Amino acid sequence: MPVEVELADKGVILNFKMIGGLNDDWEICAALILFYLWKMKEYNIQLTYNLKNNPPLISDFINKYLTAGDGLPNMVSWIKENSAHAEEIFLLWNQKQIIQIALEFYAGEKYCSDFYHLAPQYVKLINGNIDQESILLDPKLVKIIRKYWVGIFTGRGRAETNYILQKLDWLKWIPPEAVITLDSGIKKPSALGLNILRSRFQSKIGLYIGDTMDDFLTVENLNQEHKETKFLSAIVAGNDLFEKKEKGRIFLPRGLDLLSEDVNQLLLLLDNIRSGCAP
């Protein structure tokens, strides 16, 4: 009887998000499937249990071959150049289909068309995973945010972003020109999105809050390209002990300005600094 095996735990997803170029969850899905297709063909592994546990492990592959960033294109190039089974692998691997399935699971039939202009083909699910997402921000702390100019630079599309802002009850006070989405064609870690917001706010200083390597690199790129600016980078580590340790290990030696367990702690710290009460 086949044994059910989880091929990607939280640690693997974190590994991908920490290398840069894979900030997009849908591309991570495609990268995971591509890795296991490569491993299955390269090492003639048939059983799912062995596929996960026999070397090379996915974390070792990431650390050995993908640390330069560039995400999925880098992975595709490496397999094409180094695998004797590349042609067979890429006949099986359908990136567009994989991403659509992931989008359908996330948005469900309820939002798939509105968010992604797709008619669901593979997943028969009215309510997607987006309906299970909880709001991490304490609503009482919104008053702190509104003391500042607030902009959003996100990898989500405009319709999906507006859904989230509506859920937060932010649409009534954040103007559309303060939101840069994937519809603009700008993707992190390009500094262009932040620079557009900086120009619109006429600001030389700012703080960008994220949780991935691409978020950190976006700020780094902005400060390198525009010497007159000084943006700080803040990374939210979450309350998982492994994730907190990993993000501290990776980001602090690179000059991260703020590492916080959650966005609420970060906002309270900002408020204390503003009022002169910071330790």
Summary of predicted features, one role per range:
Residues 2, 39-40, 142-143, 169-172, ...:
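Alpha-helix termini
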